[in-house]
């Protein structure tokens, strides 16, 4: 008797509108754009099938397992308001489909194969609900927000950073000099650019040594704890760990990784090393726009941010909001909360499709970086609050008097904004005036 072979409709097996989701399911919200003539139910079911147990036909080995236990299910579909032929398909995946503690495996399953699917014109993963049963299998950030503040002895204000420019071409000695000037001027951190690894003009070991010298000199002179994000990203995991080990031997507080170009496996390994050895971990999101910039295809950054919190990092770049559209402000603050808070309520206006309970996974500090300067300080302080890192590259090094005065300007502006806020002044309305007053100090 056997079974009926041949091509079959996915929706017969994988579209289950009556399904009640379980607390242990991983839930995904996909923005689906079906090809002309493909019904939305079939498109949603195809996504559920191809990202879980399905293939295009019935195979005899289906009889050797329980499909009901292991299959992904498309349990709800809704049209996207204001968009033609776009739908949000909600898919539930049983927990057994995923390896514990592996972001790599989670992404390989959920977004691995299905994005090239013929029945779909475009597909975007908008959000994931990670159940506590799964998030508990991850170490998460090496230290988290509170432990970082305790290590640095800095409370009640955002932290200040600066990316050293020009990002490529400086010798290690001159690079270290720029680091010293910025830290001496009042910044908490300086930063390797994401593409500073170990190039012919500046090998990593030389850079680490000169930056460590700059850190210790600035600490001795200011009495504050300082750091420089030493970029440990490398061509192999072994080389990356070797660089992190050297940073630890130098006694510096923080290293850095490009988590998308370096990959989740490397990132999780480095994160474990950092917790075991007391290093903070700064994460840069180089390559994110390749994945998240298209509105109807790819993966939204809020998913990449959640994945980073699971894989591990103490800081991550998350956009600046300033000067962008109001709607983007809400969306950005949505994933900033996903990085910092323990529990985030579902809120479609902010792009949050599911309530997310992180239980006790440490939080990540969002980093505002890119085209910002002192006149943005009131807005940044108001938008991001205390638990953030504000990073000014050109906004520090572009000061007409030099690097150290640029750093002083940023620190004075920040302290003025925090004081004004604590005194009850309205940063949004009086921001420029607060900065003008600070200039007279």
UniProtKB/Swiss-Prot annotation:
<keyword id="KW-0488">Methylation</keyword>
<keyword id="KW-0934">Plastid</keyword>
<feature type="modified residue" description="N6,N6,N6-trimethyllysine">
    <location>
        <position position="4"/>
    </location>
</feature>
<keyword id="KW-0602">Photosynthesis</keyword>
<keyword id="KW-0456">Lyase</keyword>
<dbReference type="InterPro" id="IPR000685">
    <property type="entry name" value="RuBisCO_lsu_C"/>
</dbReference>
<protein>
    <recommendedName>
        <fullName>Ribulose bisphosphate carboxylase large chain</fullName>
        <ecNumber>4.1.1.39</ecNumber>
    </recommendedName>
</protein>
<dbReference type="InterPro" id="IPR033966">
    <property type="entry name" value="RuBisCO"/>
</dbReference>
<feature type="binding site">
    <location>
        <position position="369"/>
    </location>
    <ligand>
        <name>substrate</name>
    </ligand>
</feature>
<comment type="subunit">
    <text>Heterohexadecamer of 8 large chains and 8 small chains; disulfide-linked. The disulfide link is formed within the large subunit homodimers.</text>
</comment>
<keyword id="KW-0460">Magnesium</keyword>
<comment type="function">
    <text>RuBisCO catalyzes two reactions: the carboxylation of D-ribulose 1,5-bisphosphate, the primary event in carbon dioxide fixation, as well as the oxidative fragmentation of the pentose substrate in the photorespiration process. Both reactions occur simultaneously and in competition at the same active site.</text>
</comment>
<feature type="active site" description="Proton acceptor">
    <location>
        <position position="284"/>
    </location>
</feature>
<dbReference type="GO" id="GO:0016984">
    <property type="term" value="F:ribulose-bisphosphate carboxylase activity"/>
</dbReference>
<keyword id="KW-0601">Photorespiration</keyword>
<feature type="site" description="Transition state stabilizer">
    <location>
        <position position="324"/>
    </location>
</feature>
<dbReference type="GO" id="GO:0009853">
    <property type="term" value="P:photorespiration"/>
</dbReference>
<keyword id="KW-0560">Oxidoreductase</keyword>
<comment type="similarity">
    <text>Belongs to the RuBisCO large chain family. Type I subfamily.</text>
</comment>
<feature type="binding site" description="via carbamate group">
    <location>
        <position position="191"/>
    </location>
    <ligand>
        <name>Mg(2+)</name>
    </ligand>
</feature>
<dbReference type="GO" id="GO:0009507">
    <property type="term" value="C:chloroplast"/>
</dbReference>
<dbReference type="GO" id="GO:0019253">
    <property type="term" value="P:reductive pentose-phosphate cycle"/>
</dbReference>
<feature type="binding site">
    <location>
        <position position="193"/>
    </location>
    <ligand>
        <name>Mg(2+)</name>
    </ligand>
</feature>
<dbReference type="GO" id="GO:0004497">
    <property type="term" value="F:monooxygenase activity"/>
</dbReference>
<feature type="binding site">
    <location>
        <position position="194"/>
    </location>
    <ligand>
        <name>Mg(2+)</name>
    </ligand>
</feature>
<dbReference type="Pfam" id="PF00016">
    <property type="entry name" value="RuBisCO_large"/>
</dbReference>
<dbReference type="InterPro" id="IPR017443">
    <property type="entry name" value="RuBisCO_lsu_fd_N"/>
</dbReference>
<keyword id="KW-0113">Calvin cycle</keyword>
<dbReference type="InterPro" id="IPR020878">
    <property type="entry name" value="RuBisCo_large_chain_AS"/>
</dbReference>
<dbReference type="InterPro" id="IPR036422">
    <property type="entry name" value="RuBisCO_lsu_N_sf"/>
</dbReference>
<feature type="binding site">
    <location>
        <position position="167"/>
    </location>
    <ligand>
        <name>substrate</name>
    </ligand>
</feature>
<feature type="modified residue" description="N6-carboxylysine">
    <location>
        <position position="191"/>
    </location>
</feature>
<keyword id="KW-0479">Metal-binding</keyword>
<feature type="binding site" description="in homodimeric partner">
    <location>
        <position position="113"/>
    </location>
    <ligand>
        <name>substrate</name>
    </ligand>
</feature>
<feature type="binding site">
    <location>
        <position position="285"/>
    </location>
    <ligand>
        <name>substrate</name>
    </ligand>
</feature>
<keyword id="KW-0150">Chloroplast</keyword>
<feature type="active site" description="Proton acceptor">
    <location>
        <position position="165"/>
    </location>
</feature>
<dbReference type="Pfam" id="PF02788">
    <property type="entry name" value="RuBisCO_large_N"/>
</dbReference>
<keyword id="KW-0503">Monooxygenase</keyword>
<feature type="binding site">
    <location>
        <position position="317"/>
    </location>
    <ligand>
        <name>substrate</name>
    </ligand>
</feature>
<dbReference type="InterPro" id="IPR020888">
    <property type="entry name" value="RuBisCO_lsuI"/>
</dbReference>
<feature type="binding site">
    <location>
        <position position="163"/>
    </location>
    <ligand>
        <name>substrate</name>
    </ligand>
</feature>
